[in-house]
Amino acid sequence: IRPDMCVITNISFDHVQFLGDTLAKIASEKAGIIKPNTPVVIGETTPETKPVFAQKAAQVNAPIHFAEEENLLQESSINEQGKRIYQTTDYADLEGELGGLCQTKNTNTILSAIRILQNIGYNIKESHVREGFAHVCSLTGLMGRWQKIQEQPLMVCDTGHNKGGIQYIVEQLSMQNYRQLHIVMGMVNDKDISGVLAMLPKEATYYFTKASVNRALSEKEVQRLAGEAGLQGETYPSVKEAIEAAKNNADAEDFIFVGGSTFVVADLLSSL
């Protein structure tokens, strides 16, 4: 593969059995996509990962751009329709279809990537950028990223499943207004399950479940590990049953979150 540009969004602890058990080791594996004489955009770094990327880029003479340093996104906010509004250096206000908090860092990365592609000859107009941000789901088929399922009670799903993704989800949940939080949670067996569960809000009512894939951890085991993290709830053998229970228990002013695994979200979306 000979790309015109490479992008590495961020580094988090995931797939550690394949990528390594430190951020530096994972970054080294991810840096393998950096190609000779090809610009690369790095979305987010840590003190551990930044020198890894810089060294690899220097070895293959790849121009490297750190999106956090270019900082083409000035700030973001949510409008009344739940769309995220980005104040940007190059395009003033951009309306984004994806409302998830993690999209702020992603957008900053995208803006750096767009500028590079334009500089190497891609005919990307402002109208293209606005259309892409405003209609990313319909244009790409993307689903399950802080996706609103229903109102009263408000139900949202998100496929974030590692500590990096869950950190954004927990922060965004803390920004919501609700009477009671209900969380439908299932996980697969190759993640940092205890680490993720320890991050979740203890005041929520939990519905532990199992996605319809072989890698899914049993609902009983999720419940056991969650109990060690101070989380309480009942178990349900399928995502559909867990969601029905949450809906039955929730009042109109409550909030239902469905996540923990891409496969849990997939089971939800396939049942709609």
Residue ranges of each PLM-predicted region?
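C-terminal helical cap/extension that packs against the catalytic core
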Residues: 46-65, 154-157, 163, 194-255
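Flexible, gly/pro- and Lys/Arg-enriched active-site loops
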Residues: 11-20, 133, 144, 210-225, ...
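Active-site catalytic pocket residues across diverse enzymes, especially alpha/beta-hydrolases
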Residues: 117-121, 173, 226, 250, ...
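Short glycine-/acidic-enriched loop or helix-start segments at secondary-structure transitions
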Residues: 17-18, 51-53, 76, 166-167, ...
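Acidic, Mg2+-coordinating active-site environments of NTP-dependent enzymes
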Residues: 3, 7-87, 107, 111-127
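Active-site-proximal loop/hinge segments that shape catalytic or ion-binding/gating pockets
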Residues: 261
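Nucleotide phosphate-binding/pyrophosphate-handling subdomain across enzymes
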Residues: 1-7, 11-15, 25, 90-205
